Amino acid sequence: MPLKRPELDDPEIRELLEQGMGHNTYGEPFWPNDILIFGVVILGTIFGVIALAVLDPAKMGEPADPFNTPLHILPEWYFYPVFQILRVVPNKLLGVVLMAAIPIGLALVPFIENVNKFQNPFRRPLATAVFLIGTVVTMYLGIGAMIPDIPKSLTLGLF
């Protein structure tokens, strides 16, 4: 059923409007009280941020030196598994292919056992197994990326 404009000639709507429906009959009026308060709060926040930036600027670290990079540079924590793949795989092309396989694999996850309409994970063994294996491999690669030595990063320093 399509939406239609309310007709103000309709007696039911006229009666509701006469009883005060659709009007704020309680509290403070929006204009000018709320509008003025909103403006004061917004401008006060902007001026406060500018004052903090001017009076107490953030201290910058030492300047970057492109000829003296640290030995152990790590990306952000959410890139650890991909970083470990690139670090461990000897062939650059294979590393790029494996990195491209990650979003492709994630895009295919909804189609695994799509015919099985059960929501209980114990009744969807293939999807549950893929999820658990993916989680374990991702955690393994993420923990291994934090270890600087590549042979130790493959065994997580356990052997």
From Swiss-Prot:
It is a multi-pass membrane protein. One of its GO terms (biological process) is photosynthetic electron transport chain. It holds the Pfam family Cytochrom_B_C. Keywords: Cell inner membrane, Cell membrane, Electron transport, Membrane, Photosynthesis, Transmembrane, Transmembrane helix, Transport. One of its GO terms (molecular function) is oxidoreductase activity. CDD domains: cytochrome_b_C (cd00290). It comes from the Bacteria. The keyword Cell membrane applies. The chain crosses the membrane at residues 35-55, 93-113, 127-147. GO terms for cellular component: plasma membrane; thylakoid membrane. It is found in: Cell inner membrane. InterPro entries: Cyt_b/b6_C (IPR005798), Cyt_b/b6_C_sf (IPR036150), Cyt_b6/f_cplx_suIV (IPR005870), Cytochrome_b_C_euk/bac (IPR048260). Belongs to the cytochrome b family. PetD subfamily. Component of the cytochrome b6-f complex, which mediates electron transfer between photosystem II (PSII) and photosystem I (PSI), cyclic electron flow around PSI, and state transitions. The 4 large subunits of the cytochrome b6-f complex are cytochrome b6, subunit IV (17 kDa polypeptide, PetD), cytochrome f and the Rieske protein, while the 4 small subunits are PetG, PetL, PetM and PetN. The complex functions as a dimer. This is Cytochrome b6-f complex subunit 4. It comes from Gloeobacter violaceus (strain ATCC 29082 / PCC 7421).
